[in-house]
Amino acid sequence: MICSYTELKNLIYNSGIGSNIDVGICEEISEAVAKLELYGLNASAEIYRCFKKLSYKKDNIKIIDKSIQFGKGMVIFEGISGLDYFRTNLYDEIIFEELDSPLILIGLGLINNVENFKVLNSTSLIGYVDKKKFFWNENFTGNNVKISIKKEKFKVQQFNSVKSKIKIDKNVWKNLELLSRKILVPESNLSRDFGAGANINDND
C-alpha cells in the first residue's frame, strides 16, 4: 500500500507508545523509520520486529581508552545511546557485541545530521552517513550482529536516492496498527467515572 511520510511517521510513533516506549525515543525512531522508507528501504518491518522483541535491561557498557563497548543491544535503546556518544566526538569507536537493527541505526544517524558516520560489520562497510546523505549496502541483510561505528571519511560512489512513493506491505501496516491501538483506553467503570467527560473539572 502507498502512504504519506506523515501517515507512516505517526503510525510508527503510536506503535512505539503502544509498546510502552518513552515518548522521546518514539519521536526519534518514527522519524528515522519514515525517512528510510522515503528511500525505499524496508524499515517499517524492521522496527515492528524490534518492537515485538523488546527486552528492558541495564546497559552493559565498557569504556576502554577512546572506545565504548556495548554488549547485546537494541537500536531503540543502546543504538540511540551509542549515537549520542558518537556525537560528543570524544570516542574513536562505538562497538556493539550484537545489535538488532543496523539499518535503523543508519536512519538515526541520518536524522541527527551526523558526519563521517561509518557503520561496519566486522571489517565490511554496511552504511555511511555524511552531510544529510547516506549509503546503505542493500546486499547486507544481517540482524543481531556485531557492529562498530567509526568517525572516518569515506568516498561513496553513490548515495541512496529518494523514491517517488512510500510503499508499505499491508501486513506490516496492519501489525503496526494493532500495536498502536494499545494506547486506546479500554472502556470501564473507572474510565467512565474518572476519564474525559466525567465532569471532574471545568474542562470536561
Where would I find each of the regions flagged by the language model?
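Residues at alpha-helix termini
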Residues: 15, 19, 112-115
